[in-house]
A protein has these predicted regions:
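Short glycine-/acidic-enriched loop or helix-start segments at secondary-structure transitions
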Residues: 15-16, 46-47, 67, 97-99, ...
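Short histidine/acidic/glycine/proline-rich micro-motifs that form metal-
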Residues: 10-12, 62, 118-121
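Glycine-rich phosphate-binding loop signature in dinucleotide/nucleotide-binding domains
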Residues: 78-85
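Alpha-helical scaffold elements within enzyme catalytic domains, especially in hydrolases
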Residues: 26-27, 78, 103
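N-terminal subdomain of nucleotide-sugar transferases
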Residues: 1-44, 49-54, 107-109
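A short, charged, and often flexible helix/loop element on the N-terminal side
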Residues: 50-77, 89-91
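An aromatic- and histidine-rich active-site surface loop
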Residues: 71-72, 85-109, 115-123
Length: 128
């Protein structure tokens, strides 16, 4: 299967989401799947592949409430135009999920959304 994993940060960035997605991506590759990770462009990442996982960087930041900056349209085009079988987005309230919200109906692949907390919901901006 062709699988796209979307997360705000990925290796060499360090954190819980990054580790979960890295483990998932690499284990899917070992099982014979073609895995791409869509993530934030980092100046410390000097590779486009890691342990069989293709990394596609996007210069995007923010979310729907605070506003998104960067190449949001490029990210949407990438996700909606590639023949992925499954797309998994880890975490909400960040650009890899929020940028796809208006384009969900254009994504033909199966979609899996895994929220790992809604830590910003107490903020007044999320009340509307």
């Amino acid at each position: 299967m062709r699988i796209l994993l979307c997360c705000e940060f990925y290796s060499p960035s360090v954190g819980g989401v990054q580790e979960v997605m890295k483990q998932l991506a690499e284990r899917l590759v070992v099982r014979g799947h073609e895995v791409t990770v869509a993530t934030t462009e980092l100046p410390t990442r000097f590779f486009g592949q890691l342990n069989g996982v293709t990394i596609r960087e996007f210069k995007v930041s923010g979310n729907l409430v605070r506003g998104m900056e960067g190449k949001v349209a490029e990210y949407r085009r990438f996700v909606t135009s590639q023949p992925f079988d499954v797309i998994m987005v880890k975490a909400a309230q960040q650009w890899t999920f929020d940028a796809l919200w208006p384009a969900l109906s254009k994504i033909k692949a199966g979609k899996v959304f895994v929220p790992c907390g809604f830590s910003g919901l107490y903020e007044p901006a999320y009340a509307e």
